[in-house]
């Protein structure tokens, strides 16, 4: 539907897979998200056994090699099927993945939430990274690791984007955006307009405090 709307408006359709992953929060009591009927039955059919009970996202994925292969495969198959379906009607449609680096910074999440065979620069036009936790924790060193992460996945600077969460002036979101701009990405995106308006920022945004001194 989105590709159709964009095409009707005279645009080249551009579709995002927004945070397509296995979400897990250790403090909300929901447990691991792998055990719905479809996932468990598909795993059983493929491997002839029940999926291992995984209790934490800090587990070493090498100890569960079949699950570590199967789970990202489902994500990759899902996005690949959508790409094929949409491009059958809109062959010039462009696709990007929004990938949150911070919430995947655990041994298991790094493996199961990035299907390396499918999420490549050959299949996607852009990889967009984000890391709101690093921004809100005021850690520019970690924000930089998020900004740079796409290179390790094989995406050139022109094939990458970075999403920055707008926050109050005590966080370093503007500095993070300027750092990302320095890498020559396709885009640096500020999220979101409602935050921008509620806080009351004005345009143009600050380019940072700079001083120059000439001593002749």
Feature roles, as predicted:
Residues 1-89, 101, 109-114:
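Polysaccharide-binding and catalytic clefts of secreted carbohydrate-active enzymes
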Residues 5, 81-89, 114-123, 148-149, ...:
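Alpha-helical structural signal in soluble globular domains
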Residues 9-13, 90-95, 155-158, 184-187:
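Loop/turn elements at helix/coil->beta-strand transitions in domains of secreted/extracellular proteins
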Residues 16, 88-136:
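Substrate-binding cleft/loops of secretory-pathway carbohydrate-active enzymes
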Residues 22-23, 119, 173, 214:
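A residue-identity detector for tryptophan
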Residues 25-30, 106-113, 138-141, 173, ...:
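A short acidic (Asp/Glu
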Residues 59-64, 94, 154-155:
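Generic detector of short, locally flexible boundary/turn motifs and exposed helical patches
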Residues 124-216:
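Substrate-binding cleft of secreted/luminal carbohydrate-active enzymes
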